[in-house]
Structures are given as C-alpha cells and as structure tokens.
Amino acid sequence: MTIAHHCIFLVILAFLALINVASGATEACLPAGQRKSGMNINFYQYSLKDSSTYSNAAYMAYGYASKTKLGSVGGQTDISIDYNIPCVSSSGTFPCPQEDSYGNWGCKGMGACSNSQGIAYWSTDLFGFYTTPTNVTLEMTGYFLPPQTGSYTFSFATVDDSAILSVGGSIAFECCAQEQPPITSTNFTINGIKPWDGSLPDNITGTVYMYAGYYYPLKVVYSNAVSWGTLPISVELPDGTTVSDNFEGYVYSFDDDLSQSNCTIPDPSIHTTSTITTTTEPWTGTFTSTSTEMTTITDTNGQLTDETVIVIRTPTTASTITTTTEPWTGTFTSTSTEMTTVTGTNGQPTDETVIVIRTPTSEGLITTTTEPWTGTFTSTSTEMTTVTGTNGQPTDETVIVIRTPTSEGLITTTTEPWTGTFTSTSTEVTTITGTNGQPTDETVIVIRTPTSEGLITTTTEPWTGTFTSTSTEMTTVTGTNGQPTDETVIVIRTPTSEGLISTTTEPWTGTFTSTSTEVTTITGTNGQPTDETVIVIRTPTSEGLITTTTEPWTGTFTSTSTEMTTVTGTNGQPTDETVIVIRTPTSEGLITRTTEPWTGTFTSTSTEVTTITGTNGQPTDETVIVIRTPTTAISSSLSSSSGQITSSITSSRPIITPFYPSNGTSVISSSVISSSVTSSLVTSSSFISSSVISSSTTTSTSIFSESSTSSVIPTSSSTSGSSESKTSSASSSSSSSSISSESPKSPTNSSSSLPPVTSATTGQETASSLPPATTTKTSEQTTLVTVTSCESHVCTESISSAIVSTATVTVSGVTTEYTTWCPISTTETTKQTKGTTEQTKGTTEQTTETTKQTTVVTISSCESDICSKTASPAIVSTSTATINGVTTEYTTWCPISTTESKQQTTLVTVTSCESGVCSETTSPAIVSTATATVNDVVTVYPTWRPQTTNEQSVSSKMNSATSETTTNTGAAETKTAVTSSLSRFNHAETQTASATDVIGHSSSVVSVSETGNTMSLTSSGLSTMSQQPRSTPASSMVGSSTASLEISTYAGSANSLLAGSGLSVFIASLLLAII
C-alpha cells in the first residue's frame, strides 16, 4: 500500500469515528436476565496460508459463520491475543516471540530452528481451546458496561493477520440476542482488516460515546492465516484511565431473551425510566380528592428512575370519623388526624379517621413534679393523665416532670487502685430503693488510681517452651481493713527441661497469696549437678490449720506437695486446712519386679503401687513392676552328617514330632497321673520358677527306640563346657545328645549362656565364681500327644501319653520356659551318687546329691479312644544343689513301661566297602520317617536301617550342677563329668543294639573311643543345645574291626597321655593327629 492510499485510509477511519461521536446515538441494551462475567468466544475453521479471505469485509462481519465451527469457550476477560510458534533447536523446543526471530528462521537465545514456519501447529494457547492458532478465525461477543458517561477509545496496537471491533446494538449484535447468528453490518468501530497484499498501520483506534449504566454490545472478529498471531486490545476511559488486555469488570454476557420488549435502548441520552403508583386514602372532606407526588428512585442497575405516586382521597362516612380532644401545654389549639382500621359487626374492615384536637389546659389542671436524675442537665417532659373530679366527670390533667441533676448525697464516689500509670474515672449508675419504697437512681463515680509499687509482684516460673514468656495476672486481695485491692502479678516463664519443675503449695500467715520461685541444684544418678526449679505458692491460712505428713515413694528425690481440704470446726463453720505431704525416696528393697508370660506379641511393662505396713506399724508404698513377655516357640535343632534340621512347635497342648532312628519307630500309649514337687536352685542372677502352663512355649523332644530297647529320658539341670569322659566301649565312635532351646524373651537369637559355676566330678575339681541367686521350680503332669508314623510317604496318627515337665528361668528380668516330655520306658534304675564341690579361690561351697529310687504310679493306657488305668513302677530321680546357703531340689519321675514299639521292615540293598572294594547284598531293614517343620513348612526324612541282633539298655540320671550318664552297651561303660557355666537343657538319649553302631554328632564336641578304657576330653561351647543320636549300621562303615581296634589303641594311648604332664600332652596331640 502506497503512502497516499495509507493516508486516505486513516482519514476515512477518523471521519467515521467523528460521525459516531457527533451523533451520540450508539444503541444500548438493558438485559433483564442474570449477567455473567466475561465474553463468549467461538472458533471457526480457516485454511492455512489463505491470505485473501480475511481481507473481505463481509467475511469478517458475518461470512466466517459459514465455515465449520470448531467449538467455543465462555467467561473470558483477558481478550488480547499473543501466539508464538515453536522453535525446534538443538537445546529443545521453545515458543519463539516474533520480535526474537531473525534471518532464515532463527530465534535469539536458541539458535537456528529446524522446524518450518509454514505449517499448522496445534496447542491450547488461545483461551485454553485446543486448535491450530496458526490458522483459525474466532469471534468474541459480550456486553461492555461503561462505569462513566463519555467517550471511550478502543485500540488495536497491532494486528496479525486481520481483525475488526464493533460496539453498539445493530452493529455488533442485537440486544438480548448475543448467541444469535451474526448480523450483516459492516459499520465497524475499528477496521483492522488486512488489505490484499498489503499491511496495516499500528495503533488503530475507534471512539464511542457511551452512557454509564447501560450495556453496549461488543464484538471482535480475528483471523490468522499462518505462523504468529497477534491482537493486543485496550480501551481508554473518559477519565483517562487505560484498560489493557484484561477487561474484568467491564465485559459481561447474558443469555438470550428475545421476548424482552424493553431490552433495546435506541438513544440512552433521552431514555427515562418511570413508574406510576396509585394509592387511595380516606379523608373527612365531602368529595374525592386526587393528587400526584413525584419521587426519584435508583433501580438495581444504578439508573435513576422517576416514580409517580397518585394519591386518591375519598370521603369517609360520618360514623367512621372520631373526634377526640386532648389538653396540652401549648398556648394554641392543635388539630391532627390519625387513620386507623376497625372491623365492624359485619366483619368487614373499615378505615376510621380519628381527629385529635389538643387545646390549652387551664392553669389549675397542670401539675408540675420535680425528680432527681443522674444527668448533668435539667430534663423537662410532659405526661398526660385523666383524673375524676368531685362532680364525677373525667378531666385531663397535664403532669410536667422536671428531672434535675441529683443532689450531692445521691452521688457516691469510690476510689480503687489499678496497675495503670494514670488515673481512670468512670461512672456507674445503679438503682436503689429508698425508705419510701420508691426507686432512685444512684450515680457511683469510680476513680482508679495507680497502685503503689508494693502491689506489683513479679514471679518467675519455668516452663517447657523454648522461649521466655511474660504475662500479667490480676488478682484481688483483701487487706486488713477489709477493703479489696487489685494486685498485679507479673509472671515470667523461662525455658527449662520438663522433668526439673516442681510446684509446692505452702500456707502462711499473710493475707494474700504469694508465689515465689526457688532454684536448687540436685545431683542425679550420673553424678552430674542439675538445676531444679521449685515453685512455692503460699496461701493465707491460720497458723493452727497446717498439717505436715511424710510418705515414702519410689522416686529418687524428695517431693513436696500441698493438698487443700476443708474441715468443719466446733463452731460449725468450714475452714480450709493445708496438708503438706513430703514424699521421700524409699529404699531399693521396696521395688519388686515380677515377670509374667502373656499371649501378646510384645513385652508389656506396668507398675502397680501397693501399701504395706512395716514392723514399726508405719505404712510404706511398695512398687511392683510387672513385665509381661510374649510366649513364642522354642527352636530345636538336630545336627547330623547331612546338615541341620530346625523345627519350631507352638501349641496350646504339647505336640511331639519324633525323629525316628533308622531301625524302628517308637509309639508310647500310656499316661502317668501327675505328681509334683517344688524345689529351688540358686545360680547367677537368674530366677527359675516352674509351673505347668498348657498354653506356654513348648520344646519338641526327639524320641529314639527299638522294639526291644527301652530308654529313660530324664529332665535335668546340668552344666556343659569342658567335660571329661571315661569310656569303655568297643564302638568306633561315641554318641551324645541334648535339647537346645532359645529364650523366647532374649534380645538375641543365640543359645542361652550363663556365667560359670563351681561343679565337682569324680577325679576332678574345678573352681569358678558364683553369680547372684536363681531359683528353679519344676512341676510335672501327664498329657496325651499325637504321634505321626509314616511309611512309603503314607503317614498315620495315633494318640500316646507322655510326662510333661515345665520349668521357667528368669535371667536379668527375662523369663524362659522349658517344657519336657518324658516317655514311659521299661528300664529300671536304682543308683545313688554323691558329688562334692569344694570352695576354691573364695567361692562358696556347693554340695550336690543325686538319688534315684523307684515308686508306684498310676498309668493310663489308651487305645481306640478307650483308656484304662494300671499301677506301674517308676524311677524317681532327685537332685539337690546348695549355693550360698540356698538349696535347690529337682525331682523327676519316669515310669517303667512294658510298651514295645512297633516297627516296619522292608528289603534294601546294602553296599559294603573294604580297602576300596565294594559289594552289594540284600537285607531286611527297618523303615522310619522323621519330619521337620521350618517356617510352617514340613519336610519328611525317611531312613532305612538294616536289622541287627544286639540289644542294649540305657539308664541315665540327672545332676543339678553336674551331669553323669552311665551307658550299658554290652561290656561297655561310659562315664561323663561335665564342668561349665550353668545351662538349662533336657537330656534325651537312646542307644542302638550294635556295639559298633553308635555315631556321635555334635558341632562342638570332640570324642575319641577305644576298645578298652579310653579317657576322652570333650570341649563344649557354652550353650543350651539339643542333640538326638542316630545309628549307623556296621556294614555301612568303612574299615574293618581290626582297623578300628588299631585306631582305638592309638586313641587310648593319646587319651592316657592327655592326663599327664605338658610333654605328655604334646605327644598325645601327635598321636591324635595321626589318628
């Protein structure tokens, strides 16, 4: 476009603007519906790179609506457009403002852009609507509400690509028809249509004269053909204020209402809103009177509206006019009319006119009375009353009441102290009744003067906050003159630890409450001094009403507290009595700890306080600390050449899962009526108590036996550690077993370990220190258990009986329960032994006696749920231990049973090897099955053992401080003496029929056997363990009996040397290494 054409275009636009301003006839609207903030925006399709369609005025006015409508949004107040196309660079994709683009498509700060400017891009950059801002036409419609009357100048700062703006009805859209199709007017307020192959100037404007309070239709149409899109919109108000981009508070939308007849206001300058109201009133005239009154009101949209009120007065009937005369104090006659509504006898309401004539009263009918009041000036009022004269006629009397300020005697002045720094005066009015029964107003003037310095008290208190807090509390104290006085207490709270604050209340002879803070230093159990704050509150009381009492308590410091009680004296009057309670720390012996099992999953600690009366007759508080620990399963382990099997059993009644030997299955089906004995054993820092608890933790004991072999499994309390074994056996190895269980309340999962104690065995003395006291109590009973027998992967269950022994051990406040099942056997053993522990290196003397005898017990045998009772002999084992003068007695009953176990046999192939040459033979074998449960997973272990012909018997006995076991295997004899720290375990042992068929398996035991007499040193770690012996057939062992004899001879020599001097020990070690 040339410069000449450009100038002509601007002149035309200016001329059109002047015409609009001069005419002042822009059409406005007054929609009656509910207005909504913002404008509605409709989106229409526009072809990419179409640079001709948007240059058509008809298209920009209404032709766009023929295109595909893409959607719409509402409530938009920020109506400017500023869209930037994306730039895809090596550093990422970012919107690039048009003013930052350069060269052959590059963007400042991002470098060269690899994408094209001439393609369509989708985004929600236009009013949140997902479309292609690069090529689109949109229409904005709404109502502009001018806040002032005057000229409004709208402006497009720049246009890219084409836009128009129209203001006014019949130009933008018709009133109350915002959502209708666009009208065909091309009389644009701002014409920003881009000419064909040309450009537009900046800052295109259009001016409209608008009247405040009217709604003017506003429409903006914008088209973009490619790439960037720009349309900043602003308006300048008559007062010079400019609104840019955000038009909130200026643009609104209304729903269409085509039926509203008065929606369009063609010329607001001559528009007036008026209403006519007609009212009818009765009057005393004889004709109808009509009058008109004009008022101006403001309507809801802020417009002034003229209101015409037509008043019609009609004559009332004579009977509805009432005239009344009243005297008054004026000097002239006053007439007034009052209108009331009365209901006649016909039930119809009728207007009644009351004419009130007030005439001046005669001087004699006027009464004047004077009353005092609390005001500061004289008040005069008139009251009208009616009196009846001597002639019986009523007469109006006027009473003039003059209220004068009250005399000085009715004014009371009181002075009160207060904590302010200036004098405060206030007036309070009260009503009192005089002797004449009449109420009288009394004025009380209260003067508050600053109190003297002595009435302000400052106290410091500790608190648990992290900063210093200052507050003021007002209290009232009564002095000796009986007058109340305000006292100000300034409380300063300083941070301190929570546990070091003590508050005590003390009576005193003063007349007010005194609060003070005392700081003392106490030394804690760690030896460190700590500041303690004691808040002392002293309350007034008579000297004789103070009582002090001292009580013991379990704290580590002295506590003083004050308790207030009310007593009634002989005069019947209540009196406050102050009781000062001083609690002093009790001795350590008044704190008792007890441990109880419970079914919870955690350890619970609670404290119970009881009061006991000592020998001096004084009550003393005793603190009982109750520790409840959960009962859990006890783990037992079986060590063998094939590894370790761990099983755990927890049940409300004992369950035995036997590990069968390779040569048979043991089934016990009898029960023993329980008898119990209570004993005690003192050991290091442990308290042992025993009781039968069916729901407590149980330990599963493995049982091994043959059909012709019986076993005795005593329950014992013994020691293990370094042990000396004297063995006479023809076997090539030894066997040992014990039961290991964890303390369920121990903080670790290791085996229980106790400090060493002194024990004595034959031919050996050992010295060690004794720990603090431990007590053991054991009780026994019988129960029915389920025995599972398996063959060829088929298992059956049967009911059997066993003796149940339960013991509890308390170490450092942690209690462990041990349960033992003692099977009923046929072995009879009667033997007594004695052991003596001598005092060495200052340790205490201990004497251990073990006796075994037989007695008769009642046995219940059950089969197919039918039980019978028989009398049977039983072995009674008794052990006593004396440590520090405390004796522990442990008794075990094991019945002598005649029950034989049932076995199952099958044919197996036996491979025998000698000197590297192996041969296979077929032999009958006993099949047994063992089960192990780990984490609720059950594993079945079958064992096949070729049958043997030898028989053996086993007898064992228990010793509290020592353990001595005698094993009969043909001509073999085994004696074991054990010295170690005290360990609690249940011992179960059986022997097989073969003298060469015993295999020892213990992770911490080294044993050497010989054919003759062999001295074997066994070293065992401090533990509580469980071992179950297993047998191995002679045919499965490598080597001949000759070789075994030769090795045993070396072993015998080595063991003999071990008991000699140091040189002998060295030689013995070489011999053992050769073996």
Swiss-Prot record:
Residues 322-349, 366-394, 456-484, 546-574, 702-781, 948-980, 1016-1038 are annotated as: Disordered. It is a lipid-anchor; GPI-anchor. Its main location: secreted. Sequence repeats lie at residues 278-322, 323-367, 368-412, 413-457, 458-502, 503-547, 548-592, 593-637, 667-686, 687-706, 775-825, 847-897, 898-948. Residues 322-345, 367-390, 457-480, 547-570, 702-762, 959-977, 1016-1026 have a biased composition (Low complexity). Residues 1053-1075 form a propeptide. GO terms for molecular function: D-mannose binding. Residues 1-24 form the signal peptide. Residues 763-781, 948-958, 1027-1038 have a biased composition (Polar residues). Residues 278-637 are annotated as: 8 X 45 AA approximate tandem repeats, Thr-rich. A lipid is attached at residue 1052 (GPI-anchor amidated glycine). Residues 667-706 are annotated as: 2 X 20 AA approximate tandem repeats, Ser-rich. It comes from the Eukaryota. It is found in: Secreted, Cell wall; Membrane. Keywords: Cell wall, Glycoprotein, GPI-anchor, Lipoprotein, Membrane, Repeat, Secreted, Signal. Glycans are attached at residues 135, 187, 203, 262, 663, 749. GO terms for cellular component: cell periphery; extracellular region; fungal-type cell wall; side of membrane. For many industrial applications in which the yeast S.cerevisiae is used, e.g. beer, wine and alcohol production, appropriate flocculation behavior is one of the most important characteristics of a good production strain. The ability of yeast cells to flocculate is of considerable importance, as it provides an effective, environment-friendly, simple and cost-free way to separate yeast cells from the fermentation product at the end of fermentation. Cell wall protein that participates directly in adhesive cell-cell interactions during yeast flocculation, a reversible, asexual and Ca(2+)-dependent process in which cells adhere to form aggregates (flocs) consisting of thousands of cells. The lectin-like protein sticks out of the cell wall of flocculent cells and selectively binds mannose residues in the cell walls of adjacent cells. Activity is inhibited by mannose, but not by glucose, maltose, sucrose or galactose. Belongs to the flocculin family. This is Flocculation protein FLO5.
